[in-house]
């Protein structure tokens, strides 16, 4: 029997943040229409990738339950003190069996179902290291969405070095590498919940 094919893209759900603007609750476990936000995202992200990872620094057992239908693996930051999404990215890069990692926050229930395919096409066409989503509104205003990205896992050592140096800004680290921006016209697809008010607004959209 031939060996199973190696996965080409890992999906990484970023659920390891503090959620300071939501009283420190675990955002991915908050309910939208009776379903945890993280599960909404997993249902959209997992079909687009070959393996699924969940970056969670709290409630690992609960995330394991949510991720079980997708054979998701639960990972935690290598660095302490909740240093931000870059730490989750690093953990995902280290854990991935695939050479590419597609990431998404855990609180974006309307994630585009063609996100990964479009990021991959741009990454390959431009021979880039990173492909990042950018929304464009009706007034042609561009808004980068740095936590919706496709990255080469070969960048892990550089990212680890920058984190060790105290860098925490996602876009500043992206700027060190060839990054291609991929336009998305549906702003709704990237709506998230950074506050209780925004979570309530998601339910009305």
Curated annotation (Swiss-Prot):
GO biological process, one term: bis(molybdopterin guanine dinucleotide)molybdenum biosynthetic process
Record-level Gene Ontology MF annotations: GTP binding; metal ion binding; molybdenum cofactor guanylyltransferase activity
Keyword Lipid metabolism: no
Keyword Transferase appears in the UniProt entry: yes
Residues spanning the membrane: none
Reaction catalysis annotation: Mo-molybdopterin + GTP + H(+) = Mo-molybdopterin guanine dinucleotide + diphosphate
Binding site for Mg(2+): 107
A single cellular component GO annotation: cytoplasm
Coiled coil regions in record: none
Localization annotation: Cytoplasm
Cofactor or coenzyme needed: Mg(2+)
Keyword set, alphabetical order: Cytoplasm, GTP-binding, Magnesium, Metal-binding, Molybdenum cofactor biosynthesis, Nucleotide-binding, Transferase
Main location: cytoplasm
Domain topic, free-text comment: The N-terminal domain determines nucleotide recognition and specific binding, while the C-terminal domain determines the specific binding to the target protein.
Functional description taken from the UniProt entry: Transfers a GMP moiety from GTP to Mo-molybdopterin (Mo-MPT) cofactor (Moco or molybdenum cofactor) to form Mo-molybdopterin guanine dinucleotide (Mo-MGD) cofactor.
Complexes and interactors: Monomer.
UniProt protein name: Molybdenum cofactor guanylyltransferase
Species the sequence originates in: Burkholderia orbicola (strain MC0-3)
Name of the gene: mobA
């Amino acid at each position: 029997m031939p060996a199973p094919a190696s996965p080409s893209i890992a999906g990484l759900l970023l659920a390891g943040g503090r959620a300071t603007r939501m009283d420190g609750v675990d955002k991915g476990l908050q309910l939208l229409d009776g379903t945890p936000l993280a599960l909404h995202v997993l249902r959209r992200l997992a079909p687009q990738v070959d393996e699924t990872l969940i970056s969670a620094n709290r409630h690992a057992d609960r995330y394991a339950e949510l991720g079980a239908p997708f054979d998701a693996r639960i990972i935690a930051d290598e660095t302490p003190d909740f240093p931000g999404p870059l730490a989750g990215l690093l953990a995902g890069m280290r854990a991935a069996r695939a050479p590419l990692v597609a990431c998404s926050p855990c609180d974006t229930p309307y994630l585009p179902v063609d996100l990964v395919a479009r990021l991959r096409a741009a990454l390959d066409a431009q021979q880039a290291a990173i492909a990042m989503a950018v929304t464009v509104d009706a007034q042609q205003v561009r808004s980068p969405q740095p936590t919706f990205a496709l990255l080469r896992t070969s960048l892990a050592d550089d990212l680890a070095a920058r984190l060790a140096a105290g860098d925490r800004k996602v876009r500043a680290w992206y700027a060190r590498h060839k990054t291609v921006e991929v336009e998305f016209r549906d702003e709704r697809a990237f709506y998230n919940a950074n506050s209780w008010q925004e979570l309530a607004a998601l339910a009305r959209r």
